[in-house]
Amino acid sequence: YRDEPWPEQARRYAAMVSMVDRQVGEVLDLLKDLGLEENTLVFFSGDNGGADYFSNKEHPRGIHGANVNPQTGVEYRGKKGNLYEGGLRIPMIARWPGRIAPGQVSDLLWYFPDVLPTVTELAGVTMPDDIDGLSIVPELLGESAAGRPQPTHDYLYWELGGQTAIR
């Protein structure tokens, strides 16, 4: 991206995204080459919402745009590093050939503590009752549409820099 007529930060961002894409592709290719693809659940997600740190006159909301929901076009308040929706709402991609239907889209509200109960259920391990997360296996495998209800959180809680958010 060195030759692109973009601001320096935009070229760096594009390079980082391209590098992540290549590296994830290498991991997925290796799983396939080792014959582990259909026996491996891969999660991919971020740890926070988008950033608008690289704003300038041309891109006042940041070089990679505002935190806009790609399906609704609604802009979320906040960004990386705060407790508004734009700082907390992140996508997650799950891939498991033969088990998770490609192209599946869900609006299930989940968070990282849900990963542990999910993988332990898939491994056949019983979780203690005092674990914060919920298994999202029914949603991942399409079982919620087939009659196995997907449990949901009564509330979610975040803390950052002396602030709290409850949803």
Regions from the language model: what does each represent?
Residues 7, 11-18, 106-110, 130:
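Soluble non-cytosolic domains of exported or imported proteins
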Residues 1-11, 51-60:
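Active-site His/acidic residue clusters
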Residues 86:
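Ligand-binding/active-site lining segments
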Residues 14-17, 21-28, 32, 116-120, ...:
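Non-transmembrane alpha-helical segments in soluble domains
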Residues 45-46, 93, 112:
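Generic enzyme active-site microenvironment
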